[in-house]
Amino acid sequence: MRNSIVYFCLLVCCITVRAEELKLWYSHPAEEWVEALPLGNSRLGAMIYGNPFEEEIQLNEETVWGGSPYRNDNPEAYGVLSEVRKLIFAGREITAEKLWKEHAFTKQNGMPYQTVGSLKLHFPGHEKYTDYYRDLNIENAVATVSYKVGDVTYTRTLFTSLADNALIIHLEADRPHSIAFEASYSTPFEESAVIASKNRLTLSAKASAHEEVPAAIRLESQARIKTSGGKVESDNGKLIVTEADVVTIYVSAATNFVNYQDVSANESKRVDVILNQVGKKSYRQLLDSHIGKYQQQFGRVKLDLGHSLASQKETPVRLKEFREGKDPALVTLMFQFGRYLLISSSQPGGQPANLQGIWNQHLLAPWDGKYTININTAVS
């Protein structure tokens, strides 16, 4: 009998470990950008901080770049090529280098990939909370945040749909009329505006100029709120939700980018088309179609390097203890996380993953977030 009990306990532990393996999970909110949870569908990127009181969802759209279509080659280069060769063969390398720099290069070094900004959700009264948990399930590309305020449990479920081209934010509470928050946009772009009307919040902006190349990319992001119970009001660039039972927020973004030499599209119409279609579906339909499409790609590869009880610990602890102990499942998790990031940042019909995949909080990212072919191609 004792052996049976031991076997049952070990079996339960193994089941728990397997269930947690392909999740990154944390017992605290993200304090900085690199700790936020990345969601993406190639076109849209989102970083989820998971703060109960002041949720920030930093947004990216794959075609938000500084500058505008331009030529980065110097037409004078060919004319000096012969002279540069002669100087090199004559042993005058310094002179050759100076001549080449003067006539082969331009003032531009490539345009920067830029952020859209952030959608912020302010929850009054949620400063003090308990039982906090957040995770990113890379088997279904869904992030979850849960916590308690008093005796009410709040849950946020977020995913960037591969099937429907939108970020879905689903808010629930286990007590009726308990959801109340303010939604607002922020952006670092100087030329920008935010309008709140009924259940819709709209951010419009123009990307920035760079290295004497004028700005041409226009962008728009919309957040539309649907509630069960309660009400939605607009006030001074914000949407205010009170006494709701369940809330779903549909978010998307688009630009006027058509291709590398054409920026003539209508970004507002693009966003409207996406969100009008999304609004026709239930939350469950959106979730199921997203998971189904994601798993068509993610499910192609399985990897099992073994299991250990370390899999039950939260991700930061596992990373810290990895050198000192055995956690083969963490290697599996990191391998699959790499696949998750590439699936989420590069899909057929979209732009290739850039130097930061699709996630970037800056107007001037490290190395501009550009396509550095010697690195991007090899690593991705």
Which role fits each region the language model picked out?
Residues 1-20:
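Bacterial Sec-dependent N-terminal signal peptides
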Residues 20-379:
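Aromatic-residue-lined binding/catalytic grooves and analogous aromatic/hydrophobic interfacial grooves
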